[in-house]
């Protein structure tokens, strides 16, 4: 049975609502680093543009947004799993860090935890300093992450992995991570 765009959008909204109830730490972690994960490319010394790749259906959240720029690429233009035949959507905040937090992407909401599938197929959440082009103090300083944040993030990603496209993407990223480093920390 094909899911409608409206049903997909409602599913994403429910995920957003769950993740809105938890935070990695008990304070605004952006105060530790100047919100580097939101404003990284606003520093003129950086040539990379900070964009986030969206998960399938997440692009529907940005239809009416003036604060985010939504664009897409053909899946053949970048290294993505072969199962992704359609366009890959990307989003960029137009005025970081002053974006509409109510529609920030799942990757922002679950940061700094990263989904990872081990070589034997087990699902984990990991912390990986090499994953980002900037330093996150939570990872660097080995700060304790709230248990409820870990639990909800794990449950959300576990559910998202039931989508074969999401599974293939996380699996590909996990294999790339395993080739790049073994120095990531399994959180759960």
Task: Name the predicted role of every residue range.
Residues 1-188:
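Short loop/turn segments that flank or connect secondary-structure elements
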């Amino acid at each position: 049975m094909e899911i409608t765009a409206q049903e997909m959008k409602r599913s994403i909204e429910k995920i957003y609502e769950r993740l809105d109830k938890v935070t990695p730490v008990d304070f605004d972690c952006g105060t530790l680093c100047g919100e580097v994960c939101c404003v990284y490319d606003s520093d003129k010394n950086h040539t990379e543009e900070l964009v986030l790749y969206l998960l399938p259906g997440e692009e529907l959240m940005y239809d009416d947004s003036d604060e985010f720029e939504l664009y897409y690429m053909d899946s053949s233009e970048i290294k993505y799993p072969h199962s992704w035949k359609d366009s890959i959507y990307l989003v960029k905040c137009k005025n970081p860090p002053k974006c509409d937090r109510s529609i920030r992407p799942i990757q922002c909401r679950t940061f700094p935890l990263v989904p990872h599938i081990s070589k034997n197929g087990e699902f984990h959440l990991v912390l990986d300093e090499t994953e980002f082009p900037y330093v996150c103090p939570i990872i660097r300083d080995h700060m304790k992450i709230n248990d409820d944040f870990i639990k909800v993030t794990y449950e959300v990603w576990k559910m998202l992995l039931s989508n074969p496209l999401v599974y293939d993407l996380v699996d590909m990223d996990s294999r790339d991570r395993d080739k790049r480093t073994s120095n990531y920390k399994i959180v759960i």
